[in-house]
């Protein structure tokens, strides 16, 4: 377990931003089957690996650490065992990383853009998610979702995605929560969670979206091994900071590089 020491005044400050929730199950409740048309599942090759987000008919955004040689993508899925009629399967045609490499750290450049081998069509359970027009503010209530384990004590992977609401927190909270990683003073990541614990993304949710006001703001990168632990939020790659890179790659400028 990660050991943390947070000053009392920092906790009080952040509790003023955080909003209490009635959801008590780590990872939240089963998502409405119609609220995640953009959510995709990455497989490697026979086991579920990560989540991802559909940007348009040909492009998916996820975390760089989810990359595997033989991965494939399922779109339009709700239940792993009861398929939707409009589910589609694709494989990567191309993969793009920051600086044309797979180099990333716990706090920077954990982002991968995947071009599908053929376009997908919008349908009842498939549609893209909007990229952000501005960054989220501290205190924003955001939605997380995925097929990751709903308990970190005993890994339990659901057949259907679970959703929960969490808050954007000041980056200082994550600096205090993970001192052993020596995070930089500033970062292109978002710190998000519930300070009181109880709700969080978890193993298997990596690469999935953080959605604030209907816009795609973050990609789950990493968090504490004990999901939903008090005062230990997760970190998400900040999508807004990578907009130029994303848009240039999609437009055909494959030499585009991420922000420094």
Curated annotation (Swiss-Prot):
Leader sequence residues: 1-18
Record SUPFAM superfamilies: Trypsin-like serine proteases
Keywords per UniProt: Disulfide bond, Glycoprotein, Hemostasis impairing toxin, Hydrolase, Protease, Secreted, Serine protease, Signal, Toxin, Zymogen
InterPro entries from the UniProt entry: Peptidase_S1_PA (IPR009003), Peptidase_S1_PA_chymotrypsin (IPR043504), Peptidase_S1A (IPR001314), Trypsin_dom (IPR001254), TRYPSIN_HIS (IPR018114), TRYPSIN_SER (IPR033116)
EC identifiers of the protein: 3.4.21.-
Pro-peptide region(s): 19-24
Cell compartments where the protein resides: Secreted
GO cellular component: extracellular region; secretory granule
GO biological process: proteolysis
Occurrences of domain Peptidase S1 (ranges): 25-251
Residue positions of the active site: 65 (charge relay system), 110 (charge relay system), 206 (charge relay system)
Enzyme class: hydrolase
Tissue expression pattern: Expressed by the venom gland.
Highest taxon of the lineage: Eukaryota
Subunit structure: Monomer.
Protein name listed in UniProt: Snake venom serine proteinase 4a
Source organism: Crotalus adamanteus
